[in-house]
Amino acid sequence: MLNYDIYDRQRITLHCSIKLKSPLSHIGEVSGNVSNLKTIKLIDLEGQPRSCFVYSGNALRNGILRRRGTAAALDNLGLEVNPDVHHTLFAGGRIDGSTGSDMDLDKKIRQLMPWLSVLGTAKPAGVFGVKDAQMVHGRINVGSAYLVCYESAPYIYEQFPGLLPVESLEGLRVLSDAKQALSSDPFSHPSSDAILDYANAKANYLPGLKQSLKSWTQYLLVDQTTRRDSTHDPELKRFLPGGKPTEGQLSLLGETKPKKDTEKKSDQMIASDRLIMSGATLYSRWDLHTTQVETGWIVDTLLRFAESPYLGGKGNRGNGLCSMEFWFQRGDERGHFLNISTGQNQLSEPAQKAHNSYQEYLTAYRGFLEEASASELKGFLGGAG
C-alpha cells in the first residue's frame, strides 16, 4: 500500500479571477432558436433583488476538475476501468440501493484515488468490490463564478474587493459600514442616526457606483448565425442522388431512378445566442480541505486546463477562451497562488510545492503498480492496467 497520510489536511480558500479573452456562452435555458444565459437573483446595493449572470460552480467543478483531472490521472498511471467505475469517476456516480458506511473503503479510496477524494462521488452497489452503495464526501466546494458588475458588487466586495474598480471601493465601504450599523443590535430597532447615515450613504454614493460599476446587461452581446440548408447549395447538390456526379465519382447509394421534384421544407434557420463579452471578469471562491497531494492534483489539473483554456459552450467557434488567476488564504497566511494562461503559467512557491508532492506520489504509485502482479488497484477498479 502507498505510504500516504490521508489525514494530514489543511483548509485553504482559493479566490479565482477569470478573465475572458473571447465571448463566453453558458446557457441557462433555450426558447425556440434563442439561447439565454444562466442567471441567478442577487440582492443589489439598493437592497433590491436583481438578476445577474453566473457561470455555475458545477460547470467549473465537473468541466475542469472531474473530467480533465480524472482523465489525466488515469492516463498518467496507464489505467483502464469498467463502465460502472467510469460513471462513478467521471459523472459523480449514483445511489442505486441501500447505503453503507464502510470506513475502510473510504480510507482506501482516499489513498488510491486522491482525485476522487477531492471531488467525492455516489458509489453504486458493487463498485470497488463493495456490495452496498456509499456516499464518498468530497473535499472541495467550488462556488459559481459571478460576473464582476453592479449587481454582484456587494458579494464580491465581501469576498475579494481587489477585483472591483478602484473608484468604487470607498463608496462600497461606506455603504457596507452603514448597512451593518443598522443591524448591530438585532434585538432592538436601529437608531435614528444609523437610519439617517444609511440613507445619506445611498444618496451620496449610489449615483457614482452606478457609473463605475456597470450592470451585467451592459456586458451582454447577441450573436446571430445562419444555419444554412446544405441541400440548397448548388456546389453541394452534386452529392445528392441525381445531382450529376463528376467523372469517376461513384454513388454510395447504388443506382437510383430519377424522382419528381417535390417541395421540401428548408432546414435553414437563424439562431440567436447571448454571450458575455470579451474582457469581462468573473469571480469564484473555492474552499479546500485537502492533503498536500490532493492540492497538487488540483494544481496539475489546472495546468492541464491551461493547454486549452476554454469555458462554456460553443468552443468550436472560439468562444470561452480565458485566463485564470488564483490567490490563497490559509489561516492568517495569504498571497498569490497560481496563474494559468496558454503558454504563460506561473506557480507560486506553495503551488509548486503541492505540485511536486503530487508528482512524487505518481512516481511512487507507478512503482506500486509494477510491483503488484495482481494489483489491488486493478481489482479495485475492475479494469486492467
Segments from the language model and where they lie:
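RNA-binding basic/glycine-rich loop and surface signature characteristic of RAMP-family CRISPR effectors
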Residues: 1-385
